[in-house]
UniProtKB/Swiss-Prot annotation:
Annotated Pfam families: PPV_E2_C (PF00511), PPV_E2_N (PF00508)
Gene: E2
Region (Disordered): 206-234
Purpose: Plays a role in the initiation of viral DNA replication. A dimer of E2 interacts with a dimer of E1 in order to improve specificity of E1 DNA binding activity. Once the complex recognizes and binds DNA at specific sites, the E2 dimer is removed from DNA. E2 also regulates viral transcription through binding to the E2RE response element (5'-ACCNNNNNNGGT-3') present in multiple copies in the regulatory regions of the viral genome. Activates or represses transcription depending on E2RE's position with regards to proximal promoter elements including the TATA-box.
Keyword list, A-Z: Activator, DNA replication, DNA-binding, Early protein, Host nucleus, Isopeptide bond, Phosphoprotein, Repressor, Transcription, Transcription regulation, Ubl conjugation
Organism: Human papillomavirus 33
Name of the protein described by the UniProt record: Regulatory protein E2
InterPro entries: E2/EBNA1_C_sf, Nucleotide-bd_a/b_plait_sf, Papillomavirus_E2_C, PPV_E2_N, Reg_prot_E2, Regulatory_protein_E2_N, Regulatory_protein_E2_N_1, Regulatory_protein_E2_N_2
Posttranslational mods: Phosphorylated. Sumoylation plays a regulatory role in E2 transcriptional activity.
Biased composition (Polar residues): 206-215
Keyword Phosphoprotein found: yes
SUPFAM superfamilies: E2 regulatory, transactivation domain, Viral DNA-binding domain
Subcellular location: Host nucleus
Family label: Belongs to the papillomaviridae E2 protein family.
Stretches for region Transactivation domain: 1-200
Length: 353
């Protein structure tokens, strides 16, 4: 017992020295997590040996030590990957490389420049939720590290990586819990992003986005959304800019010109006209694409199976999948969010249903 106690004391002393030094270089942060990893291993061994207390501290369960050790190993490996990237010489604090920040949304990414995003439900200042978006998000992939910028729109918080829009928080998830009308507005960076009441939460259309622009790195990390108390709600004198998404009800035109048509003068006057997207390509590719589109059901109204023109060559392996939308805004959101393979041809237009 004396030997394992002495080793644990030595490791914890080194950890305290790092806390007191408060260094901001990456090698120091890697060393910190190596020591935490050793601490987990010693506590795990102590529990296996039957000790309930060691160095005047309670020895955690085997499962607790094992779970934390796995998280620490993953974090240490990510830091070592980061140390091989162009961001290795940047300033990195204990807080920025903490397990809490590593695991908060978006999880398993390093993050800097946090900014609070407040979502107000039902136009009620007492019914709000606070989230943290990040000006810098460092995505670790195998042996590479990519920095992206956190963005906000009416749908939620996201970043763009490899030309793909990746949402890491959907506001509608909490709207289902806290909103009676399923409507909300987003307050961020002196702006308010709102959506017309004519568009429901499952038919959210394209909105303006707000980039995170702040140098405040000292904000405490938030691993989850924070429910704001009514007493914390105060009015500020700072002017707010409202950003509205397009409202189809405000469009008085009864006819729209169809796109990708030979006859450019043709107009569609039926009230049952729906925006569509034709996806044309090899049948097997379309089948895979249809499977990949299932998680994006909120971005379209319906999707057909793979079909063919009867006049086409019967030996052709190409097919067509038709996707319909409620509004043109929803169509544009679909095209801006979903990553379509370059082998698939995209055509937009309108169809009478």
């Amino acid at each position: 017992m004396e030997e394992i106690s002495a080793r644990l004391n030595a490791v914890q002393e080194k950890i305290l020295d790092l806390y007191e030094a408060d260094k901001t270089d990456l090698p120091s942060q890697i060393e910190h997590w190596k020591l935490i990893r050793m601490e987990c291993a010693l506590l795990y061994t102590a529990k296996q040996m039957g000790f309930s207390h060691l160095c005047h501290q309670v020895v955690p369960s085997l499962l607790a030590s094992k779970t934390k050790a796995f998280q620490v190993i993953e974090l240490q490996m990510a830091l070592e990957t980061l140390s091989k990237s162009q961001y290795s010489t940047s300033q990195w604090t204990l807080q920025q490389t903490s397990l809490e920040v590593w695991l908060c949304e978006p999880p398993k990414c390093f993050k800097k420049q946090g900014e609070t995003v407040t979502v107000q439900y039902d136009n009620d200042k007492k019914n709000t939720m606070d989230y943290t978006n990040w000006g810098e998000i460092y995505i670790i992939e195998e042996d590479t590290c990519t920095m992206v910028t956190g963005k906000v729109d009416y749908i939620g918080m996201y970043y763009i990586h490899n030309c793909e829009k990746v949402y890491f928080k959907y506001f509608k998830e909490d709207a289902a819990k806290y909103s009676k009308t399923q409507m909300w507005e987003v307050h961020v960076g002196g702006q308010v992003i709102v959506c017309p009441t004519s568009i429901s939460s499952n038919q959210i259309s394209t909105t303006e986005t707000a980039d995170i622009q702040t140098d405040n790195d000292n904000r405490p990390p938030q691993a989850a959304a924070k429910r704001r108390r009514p007493a914390d709600t105060t009015d500020t004198a700072q002017p707010l800019t409202k950003l509205f998404c397009a409202d189809p009800a405000l469009d008085n035109r009864t006819a729209r010109t169809a796109t990708n048509c030979t006859n450019k003068q043709r107009t569609v006057c039926s009230s049952n006209v729906a925006p569509i997207v034709h996806l044309k390509g090899e049948s097997n590719s379309l089948k895979c694409l249809r499977y990949r589109l299932k998680p994006y059901k909120e971005l379209y109204s319906s999707m057909s199976s793979t079909w063919h023109w009867t006049s086409d060559n019967k030996n052709s392996k190409n097919g067509i999948v038709t996707v319909t939308f409620v509004t043109e805004q929803q169509q544009q959101m679909f095209l801006g969010t979903v990553k379509i393979p370059p082998t698939v041809q995209i055509s937009t237009g309108f169809m009478t249903l």
